Amino acid sequence: MSWLEKILPKSKITTPRRHNIPEGVWTKCSACEQVLYRAELERNLEVCPKCDHHMRISARARLESFLDEQGRTEVGAELEPQDILKFKDSKRYKDRLSAAQKATGEKDALVVMKGTLKGVPVVACSFEFSFIGGSMSSVVGARFVRAVEECIKEGRGLVCFSASGGARMQEALFSLMQMAKTSAALDRLTKAGLPYISVLTDPTMGGVSASLAMLGDINVGEPKALIGFAGPRVIEQTVREKLPEGFQRSEFLLEKGAIDLIIDRREMRNRLASLLAKMLNTHVIEE
């Protein structure tokens, strides 16, 4: 025992009581690393309130925040993916589908809803990137075509939020065929005189960017979204040159004329409602 311990009274050292904080209450911005309250981030549509970084948002959450609450219905929910080729790589395709369905709660990588946008009749589609990288499968193509058919039948505008790595390799040519299938459907929509607004979010790559994502009457990008066919590293290795800073980001594409607008996710609802109202010769209902 030290001389200090002899002259000082013994005191019981107490530590603050640990509070059990439920998992998932806090998260961190992937750009600025600011610690954020999860509920506040969700209210801000997964956009960091400090640096305005647009994080990825689930397809269903995006559509529910985008469309009017009243009267929206899901389209093509009964369509389910099939392992036609009995494909197997390091894992069976059937097992990959089951794991993705369990993780996301979705049957496939595209969710389609019919409803109104501030009173303007629309059909809206959104890719679920967490479902096998938002890859385009036969079901994704079929649901997109169903969305187009609903627009033509009822005179609605079409909006699609893309977030995809491209065609689904496990479905081979069945997946690649969806590029032509969705493009042909959009041609019918154009001939019907109905508008299509394509919103490219982070990331939109491969076969999706080479088909339905770039065929909008108006192509919109979210801020700093990665948009292209092949990834920047693949291009650098192919051309053996250093790419410009910000290459394949939405700001770069806007500067080069590849997209028409960049819209903050929090302004998307108002801006697209205004555009669609003009294109459909109707008016928005102010909230």
UniProtKB/Swiss-Prot annotation:
Pathway: Lipid metabolism; malonyl-CoA biosynthesis; malonyl-CoA from acetyl-CoA: step 1/1. Zn(2+) binds at residues 29, 32, 48, 51. It is found in: Cytoplasm. Its main location: cytoplasm. PANTHER family: ACETYL-COENZYME A CARBOXYLASE CARBOXYL TRANSFERASE SUBUNIT BETA, CHLOROPLASTIC (PTHR42995:SF5). NCBIfam families: accD. This is Acetyl-coenzyme A carboxylase carboxyl transferase subunit beta. It comes from Aeromonas salmonicida (strain A449).
